[in-house]
């Protein structure tokens, strides 16, 4: 693949990543408030604890913030992809900046099950805060574990990219 085609493809992916980043925040917000405040029957929502819908405005707003935690993780992942593909768009392929992007991506992916755990606990607290008793619930599913495993694989790729950047630098110095 030529540098020009890598640059063109990266430009197209950047548009997709930006759209996805904005769209994920907006959709999560709309779905959260639709499901919790209006009890939209067309939307099947699940919560870490049993709740009776619709929620009060305050309870819905308090629950919104922990519900956004996994969306913010997605935004952080998309941001790292944007940074990486901007480098590709500029023709920067085997440089330490790329390896740093891969490293940050790996850390975010490895953090996925822990973030989901935290979100479940905080969301269950937020949704049960006025019942007189505090309920705690969390879940970690196989997709979270899969993301963590992918994170370890991406971390190995980051190390390989660091070595490639070193080789690229040596190659440029010897010419």
Residue map of PLM features:
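Perimembrane loop-to-helix junctions flanking transmembrane segments
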Residues: 40-58
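Lipid-exposed faces of alpha-helical membrane segments in multi-pass integral membrane proteins
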Residues: 16-30, 65, 69-72, 111-119, ...
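Cytoplasmic juxtamembrane regions at transmembrane-helix boundaries
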Residues: 2-7, 81-104, 169-175
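Transmembrane alpha-helical segments in integral membrane proteins
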Residues: 66-87, 152-166
């Amino acid at each position: 693949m030529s540098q020009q085609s890598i640059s063109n493809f990266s430009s197209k992916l950047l548009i997709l990543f930006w759209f996805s980043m904005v769209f994920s925040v907006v959709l999560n917000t709309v779905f959260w408030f639709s499901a919790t405040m209006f009890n939209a029957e067309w939307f099947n929502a699940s919560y870490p604890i049993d709740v009776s819908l619709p929620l009060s405005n305050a309870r819905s707003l308090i629950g919104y913030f922990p519900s956004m935690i996994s969306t913010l993780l997605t935004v952080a992942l998309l941001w790292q992809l944007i940074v990486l593909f901007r480098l590709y768009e500029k023709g920067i392929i085997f440089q330490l900046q790329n390896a740093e992007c891969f490293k940050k991506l790996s850390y975010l992916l490895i953090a996925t099950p822990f973030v989901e755990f935290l979100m479940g606990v905080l969301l269950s607290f937020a949704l049960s805060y006025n019942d007189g008793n505090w309920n705690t619930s969390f879940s970690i599913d196989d997709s979270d574990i899969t993301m963590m495993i992918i994170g370890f694989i991406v971390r190995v790729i980051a190390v390989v990219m660091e070595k490639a950047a070193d080789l690229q630098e040596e190659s440029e110095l010897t010419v």
